[in-house]
Each structure stands twice: as C-alpha cells, then as structure tokens.
C-alpha cells in the first residue's frame, strides 16, 4: 500500500487561488482581498515547521469550502430605489409606533439579490435533511462518563 502524502505548499496555494477565482468571480474587491489574505498567511508560515502539514490541510479544506459552499448575491439593478422607498416606509411606521425592528426591511433587501450559483456549488435536497438521523439510536447510560454514552445495538 502506498502512503498518502499531503500536497506541497505550492499545490495548496494554487488550489486556494483557483477556489477564490471561482467563488469570487466578478467581484474584484473581494477576490483581491481573499488572495491577499491567502498570500499573507502563506508568507507568514513560509518556513517548514511541525504544523506545516496541518496548515496545508487547512488551506486545502478552505479552498474546498470556498469552491463548493460560498455563493455570492448580486444586487438586482433597479431594486435599490424600491428598497429605499420600502425602508423609508418602515421608518415612518416605526416613528408612529407600528413597527419595532428592521428585520422585515433586511428580508426585503435580501430578496432583491440574484444569487450567482456556479457548477461547483454543492447542492442538496430537503428530503435528505428531513430524514437525517431518524434511523440512528443512541443509548444514554446513567452514571457513566460522557465518552461511554454511545453503544451500538
């Protein structure tokens, strides 16, 4: 059997840069900030150390999360004016004591965004979430340590 080796730092760095390009495509400011942070982290830990494999693994996992789980919302053009009008109505309602918070305004503003979902985004269905964990049983024994609470049937 061949032992699996951790990728080298250059491979992890390139993988992270590719992930930022995919996740933040079209948003130059965020893309630049993410790449600058990646470079800063790699430069700070340039010398080999005991924790180098752990840091490389962290970079690979971060890249995977960026690539598969980060979705950006783009404000829909023309929605800004409607959102401003809606916000001013809420301010008036709050002044009259009809409305207490800003949650409704935030929800309305968030609804006026278009999500940029690309082909790498991990997709799931709600059915798998609803049925998750229904077939598993856990026995709790009274008087035992926490590490001994689970047992298989």
From Swiss-Prot:
Its main location: mitochondrion. It is found in: Mitochondrion matrix. InterPro entries: Complex1_LYR_LYRM7 (IPR045298), MZM1/LYRM7 (IPR050435). GO terms for molecular function: protein folding chaperone. It comes from the Eukaryota. GO terms for biological process: mitochondrial respiratory chain complex III assembly. GO terms for cellular component: mitochondrial matrix. Keywords: Chaperone, Mitochondrion, Transit peptide. Belongs to the complex I LYR family. MZM1 subfamily. Assembly factor required for Rieske Fe-S protein RIP1 incorporation into the cytochrome b-c1 (CIII) complex. Functions as a chaperone, binding to this subunit within the mitochondrial matrix and stabilizing it prior to its translocation and insertion into the late CIII dimeric intermediate within the mitochondrial inner membrane. Modulates the mitochondrial matrix zinc pool. Interacts with RIP1. This is Mitochondrial zinc maintenance protein 1, mitochondrial. It comes from Ajellomyces capsulatus (strain G186AR / H82 / ATCC MYA-2454 / RMSCC 2432). The lineage of its organism: Eukaryota, Fungi, Dikarya, Ascomycota, Pezizomycotina.
